[in-house]
Every structure is written in C-alpha cells, then in structure tokens.
C-alpha cells in the first residue's frame, strides 16, 4: 500500500512522510496537485493525504479530477483553514477524513491506518467476488479461461485440450459472459485480481 502526500508546504509534507516511513508504511510526497496527477499510478492501492489550500489546483478541485479519472482510494484532507462549505463538499465527493493542521502524529497515523484498512477490506471483498464468479464456471470453462489469459489462441487451446476450436470458442464466450469481461485484456485483469 502506498500513501501519497500532496502538499505544497514541502517541509511539512516531508515531516509527514518521515513519520509514516518510521511506522513502516510506504509513502511518497508530491509538492503540487499537478505533479501528483501527472506522476501517480492509480492502480497502486493506498490512500491520499491531500492539502486543501494549494496554489493553482486546490484539494477539492484535485479530488474532483481524481473522481473523474476513476480514483477509488480514500482521501484524507488536511487543512489549516477548514470551513463548513469546504468540509461538506469534500465529504460529498467521498473524502474519508478531514484533519486540521497542525495535526498530532497519533491522530494522523490513526486516520491513515483506518483508511488503509478500508482499502484492505474493499480489496478482500473484490477478491471474494472475483473468486466466486470464477468458481461459477464449469471445469472446462476454467481451463479455457486460464489458457486464454496466458496468451494462447483458440486453436492452441483446442490442440492442448483435444477439443475443437469451435468448442473452445463456445466455452470461452460463455465464460466471458459469466465473468462479465469483453476482451482478452479484461480477462487477464480478472485473472490477476483473482490471483492477488
């Protein structure tokens, strides 16, 4: 899990990063929302500690851009200048927590650990759903799906299993419907989710 810290007050952000690292957590600092939006890999699970008041792009605007991009990890806002409107907007957009600067280290650690626990629980739920869908396939469909995800073409799968290519196509099509995937890339992502 990766904790992203976005704050234009670099000494403050570095101090938070050091605190998190000292607790055995992975953390990275971005000095601006723009740099964060350019550099971050949203596929890496974790959370975001986001300063509200930054030049150019504030925390609420950053959160909105993240939502537009499909961001799904918890956002913990930090601000020295919280007001009711800002807090309401942040929480309506799905903020996990709002902390007032300066924040006590134990309060920050508790908020981060709580947000990471939410991520773990969500990932476990997703994993259970994926495994349940996979278990709903027939044995033959499971064989074909695994071979297809490994990159084998229908004819190669047919040769390996001693069945016709048409039979492979029928089982593969049925499996795609059951797993709610539409293409090989989605199938491979599904299998990765199941194996994680």
Question: Where do the language-model regions lie?
Answer:
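Acidic, metal-coordinating helix/loop segments flanking the phosphotransfer/catalytic sites
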Residues: 29-47
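Acidic catalytic/metal-coordinating carboxylates
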Residues: 31-32, 57-64
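Active-site residues of response regulator receiver
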Residues: 51, 79
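Receiver (REC) domain active-site loop signature in two-component systems and cognate sites
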Residues: 54
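C-terminal output helix
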Residues: 83, 102-112, 160
């Amino acid at each position: 899990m990766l904790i992203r810290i976005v704050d234009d007050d670099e000494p403050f952000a570095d101090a938070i990063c050091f605190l998190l690292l000292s607790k055995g957590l992975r953390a990275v600092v971005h000095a601006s929302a723009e740099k964060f939006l350019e550099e971050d890999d949203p596929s890496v699970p974790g959370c975001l500690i986001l300063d509200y008041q930054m030049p150019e792009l504030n925390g609420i605007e950053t959160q909105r851009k993240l939502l537009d991009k499909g961001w799904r990890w918890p956002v913990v806002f930090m601000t020295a200048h919280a007001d009711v409107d800002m807090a309401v907007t942040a929480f309506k957009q799905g903020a996990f927590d709002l902390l007032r600067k300066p924040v006590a280290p134990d309060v920050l650690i508790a908020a981060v650990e709580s947000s990471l626990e939410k991520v773990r629980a969500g990932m476990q739920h997703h994993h259970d759903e994926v495994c349940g869908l996979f278990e709903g396939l027939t044995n033959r469909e499971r064989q074909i799906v695994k071979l297809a995800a490994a990159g084998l073409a229908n004819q190669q799968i047919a040769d390996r299993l001693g069945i016709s290519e048409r039979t492979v196509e029928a089982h593969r099509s049925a499996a795609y419907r059951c797993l709610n995937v539409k293409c090989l890339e989605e199938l491979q992502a599904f299998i990765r989710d199941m194996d994680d």
